[in-house]
Amino acid sequence: MKMGKIIHLGIVVEDLESAVKVYEEHLGIGPWEISCPGEFFRQLDVTGGRGLEIRAAMFFGDGYEIELIEPTGEGIYMDWLREKGPGLHHLKFETKNSYREVVDECEAVSGRPPYLEAKWPDGRPLVAYADLLKEAGLLIEIGCNEK
């Protein structure tokens, strides 16, 4: 397996609007697209449960994106915020490997299943966060573009 450049940063925040304001006014990063993708995420099977409750803001840079995530209900993001506080949650790397290859390789390294695995209602994979927290200090987002 070979990972390339970082193409996505997922950051958990307590207050989405306040975080966006800091990025825009003090860091010069913007504009942001703010969304409340609740309906979309509620339909998913997320690590054996139903949906995710979040609000999100996206910045699309030159070859990378930053996602700010504000948890609005119980789930993995709220758990993260309570346990670790706001900050970097996950990274996504450019790769030519398939979704399954990356998931399998990360499981072989850690001995653990993904921290999160979101699937469409029909069971097809959408996204996973490989848990390499102990081994490499990070969660790796793995997107599935396979039909």
Annotate each predicted stretch with a short phrase:
Residues M1-K2, K147:
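Basic/polar N-terminal segments that are highly enriched at the extreme N-terminus
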Residues I6-E14, A56-Y64, G73, W80-Y99:
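Vicinal oxygen chelate
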Residues G10, I69-P71, E141-N145:
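A structural feature that tracks compact, well-ordered secondary-structure segments
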Residues V12-D62, E101-P125, D131-K134:
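Core segments of cupin and vicinal oxygen chelate
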Residues P37, P71-G73:
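Histidine- and/or cysteine-centered catalytic micro-motif in compact active-site loops
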Residues M58-E65, I140-K147:
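Short, basic, helix/turn surface patches
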Residues Y77, K134-L139:
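Short, charged/polar, Gly/Pro-enriched secondary-structure boundary elements
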